[in-house]
């Protein structure tokens, strides 16, 4: 199962007590602030969850798989996510719990 933005808003509605509009706006605002920070070149640290960081990848040679022709892959900036140790431990603990069930 994948948790969507709409489902996240529904959870805020159910668990926190926001009305549906407030919950949707809260989720949208959170994502927008993360996007803005990354667009401005800043990393985003969510304590106990993980870090979103930007990484510059240099230009490198590539190859067209159909023709074998060498083509340059342009330099680009990518977003990476590194889970915190706390999140990793919780996921691992949950996985072990499922294995034993």
UniProtKB/Swiss-Prot annotation:
Region of interest (Disordered), ranges: 49-70
Gene3D superfamilies in alphabetical order: IHF-like DNA-binding proteins (4.10.520.10)
GO MF annotations, alphabetized: DNA binding; structural constituent of chromatin
GO cellular component: cytosol
One GO process term, biological-process aspect: DNA recombination
Function: This protein is one of the two subunits of integration host factor, a specific DNA-binding protein that functions in genetic recombination as well as in transcriptional and translational control.
Family (UniProt): Belongs to the bacterial histone-like protein family.
NCBIfam families in the record: himA, PRK00285.1
Assembly and interaction partners: Heterodimer of an alpha and a beta chain.
Name by which UniProt lists this protein: Integration host factor subunit alpha
Originating species: Nitrosospira multiformis (strain ATCC 25196 / NCIMB 11849 / C 71)
Primary gene name: ihfA
